[in-house]
Amino acid sequence: MQASKALLAALALGITGLAQAADEVVVYSSRIDELIKPVFDAYTSKTGVKVKFITDKEAPLMARIKAEGANTPADLLLTVDAGNLWQAEQMGLLQPFKSATIERNIPSQYRSSTDSWTGLSLRARTIVYSTERVKPEELSTYEALADKQWEGRLCLRTAKKVYNQSLTGTLIETHGAQKTEEILQGWVNNLATDVFADDNAVIQAVDAGQCDVGIVNTYYYGRLHKQNPNLRVKLFWPNQADRGVHVNLSGIGLTRHAPHPEAAKALVEWMTGPDAQALFAGINQEFPANPQVAPSAEVASWGSFKADSIPVEVAGKRQAEAIRLMDRAGWN
């Protein structure tokens, strides 16, 4: 009888331990603390589930998950750009997770076709222009920035960044390799300066008069404009008469060996819902991936636009080809 009681007590302790372990989720994130902590704190306040997170660049995080294998503590990988999420999927780091809630909240073009990841927020990679030297009616499409009109007037970020690789991937999907290479060559020919390390530098160069136009992610513009409302730079939405603006995302995927898959899935479902979408997108100065949720007042002030309907995972599928074409065009 005493032995039975001892066994029952041990089992109870074991079950309690499992329940406590399931009351936390571990996220590896390439987004910095200040952009994610308020969201995870809100989830903990609502559910009692603790969200632990580690931040780093996407490549080291993916290498870490791969090295940890079945012993990884990571339940979720949160990163920027569909190209990175697609890469993680190809490396075997993620597993599919079906969810009617996520399917209802997030359009299919912003989710993996294998259900391994979903978008959480959207950013447009669009044109910025000098309000002093360019009239908006002079602008039209990404492709038109290759025209002679813009010779010595264009600024770009390095081709090494996945954001430009993804934009190029969608150009390949739209135009094919030959036409895309011609466009890229035109951009390179029109450069006013060497390429920059980041989008902030592109915007600042346009403001300073080093160049007249550039291509950047919208949230960089949002951050700089917040710091300096007198910025002499504005956004322009290209390709409104055809396919629309190139849109990419921040997204999240369930790791292959997630210790708490159900708890992780519940967190992702909540993050695609109205409250979390407004909070996450607002902090990041991005657009909610859930179309039922309005963007922040600041983001809404940039105006509405037609977005490219190409599934964002195309950016990953075309990534290797995009890098080859960028290299051949001399975009370094």
Swiss-Prot record:
SUPFAM superfamilies: Periplasmic binding protein-like II. Residues 1-21 form the signal peptide. The keyword Signal applies. Keywords: Signal. The keyword 4Fe-4S does not apply. Coiled coil: none annotated. Belongs to the bacterial solute-binding protein 1 family. This is Probable binding protein component of ABC iron transporter PA5217. The lineage of its organism: Bacteria, Pseudomonadati, Pseudomonadota, Gammaproteobacteria, Pseudomonadales.
